[in-house]
């Protein structure tokens, strides 16, 4: 899950090369300017569609950047823990970022992503990793979009610092992919 499904093309090719079929791999686009709550509701519908089409009982959910917020909202508030086996946040803004200030006045999603927002306070209250889902967060020590970069860390998750990989390269990097693949395997 990233606002543009095409951002996952490299990893989809990697998963296929490692034996996954096309029917097991779904990339989904969403409108990054809308509320994360709205996106979470749309994600819920998408996951139900995938489960119906595949006959699977659960999915592995791999997300990038803001995708962590709407996905975690889905897990925490919309019953998503019943339908997700593994959750992987790649460069996820789990605790917000000050770089969202450039758009927080214009888009609800950016205001929600800004460090200290009421959305984030609610999302991160209590258990950050609810349910029986296995959680992981992969983050870079030089990600300029995440300020501070430790905002990606989730309490209760497997948190992995991957070294210096840029924000936009995180979900294209083969080394990060290998770690994610091993986590969801």
Regions found by a protein language model. Give the residues of each.
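Serine-dependent carboxylesterase/thioesterase catalytic core
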Residues: 36-126
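A structural signal for isolated positions on well-ordered beta-strands in alpha/beta enzyme cores
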Residues: 26, 60, 86-88, 134-137
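Short, structured coil segments at secondary-structure junctions
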Residues: 21, 83, 153-156
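Soluble non-cytosolic domains of exported or imported proteins
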Residues: 1-6, 33-37, 41, 82, ...
